[in-house]
């Protein structure tokens, strides 16, 4: 009988400890190492692109992507840490001055931007806030690719690292303009896109159970 009680107490204790650990995970983050460490000690520039349909619907998207991604990747606390970068506004001016830049190879673009050692291209392939034809409910999606070119490497015009991103917002159905303003949905979706497009390049914290 004593042995049986001890087993029951032990089992209850294990269940309690397991429940506490699970509760901790649900409200905590864990460190994730960089997938790509090639920014260490290098200079970089971020360019972003999207097709005309996306840019027509979201005129500031490409510029905001370059600004926000550059800010995240230039953080002095990043590990690995870049040695320098081209300011996003300078890159934006370049894209206006040379509208045909997407047709140029990575080496040429990098040289045009002052000879940076890493060129990061964020290509936005899909970006929408609603299902087509449904303006009453938010169903935001942002998807695309990230390519990093090592300009000082042996093959500067072939990506040394590539990754994809695919995020959505809101996390549940049933939210429309009456519940969430368009500006809030746009900002949340953009921030998620920036996280997923930049996180692979530095050590960062992610929730144990990420929402995106």
Question: Where in this protein do the model-derived segments appear?
Answer:
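Bacterial N-terminal signal peptides
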Residues: 2-12
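N-terminal segment of the mature soluble domain
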Residues: 40-125, 159-161, 188-201, 205
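C-terminal/domain-edge helix-coil "capping" segments
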Residues: 14-41, 113, 138-141, 147-212
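Extracytoplasmic/secreted cell-surface and envelope-processing proteins
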Residues: 129-135
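Generic secondary-structure microfeatures
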Residues: 1, 120-128, 144, 148-152
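Residue-level signal for secondary-structure boundary sites
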Residues: 54, 130, 152-154
